[in-house]
Amino acid sequence: MAGPIITDWVHRAPPAQGLERIEAYFAGHGYDMHRHDTYAIGRTLHGVQSFQYRGGWRHSLPGTTMVLHPDEAHDGEAGTQDGFHYRMVYVEPALIQQILGGQPLPFIAGGLSADPRLFAATQTLLRNVDSPLDPLEQQDALFDLAHALNRVSGVAAPRQRFDYQAAERAREYIHSALDRTLTLDELAVHCQRDRWSLSRDFRLLFGTSPYRYLSMRRLDLVRALLVQGQPLAHAALAAGFADQSHMTRQFRQAYGLPPARWLKMLGR
């Protein structure tokens, strides 16, 4: 008897600094509850994309823009029997901060927006993934996106003070420590800040904790190594995880599916 026909697929755009672009189709269940440390911004091209987000069900239809805030849990499935086809761009909060100059991250309530300013600002970043972005074109598109998010969010900035420069130094330092144990105390010494103030500012400015940021950068490295053909165990150790099972656990928590299924959907 012939096996089931695999209809789900994911296409990835060529790598770009600070963001990832994908186009995908799911016939039914897409992925389990998970969370990214990036903005997940996209649009449904065909069908209905249903997902749980911030305590309720959301339904993305063509013509609206999805804006999932960093570190907010969500899942994904088809809202009808026709499946759903969508494009998504994952944008590092650090890129938004570099454009806005260090302020609380813009937040779109409910994760969906019908605002035409946001739809227009995402047009370039959400075009066909087979069409590469020119570097300057990408930078212009990110500028438009950051300011559209800021305008559409309509959330007043909190009055507390924060140290953007120290948080940015911590973020850069984390990139130098992917393959070893890192403590908040070490980050605080490097940035010359109190550790809890640094942790608070990091979360406010980049939308996630220092540990989560470190874990996600390790998973970025794992995915790059897997695409190159490295075995799961080797990729896990090279990226600083204790072992393959530790990496697989965190991979599933971050992306809603295990690495083996992720590779299969990429056609690897």
Which residues does each predicted region cover?
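N-terminal positioning helix adjacent to the helix-turn-helix/winged-helix DNA-binding module
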Residues: R117, F162-A170, F206, S215-R218
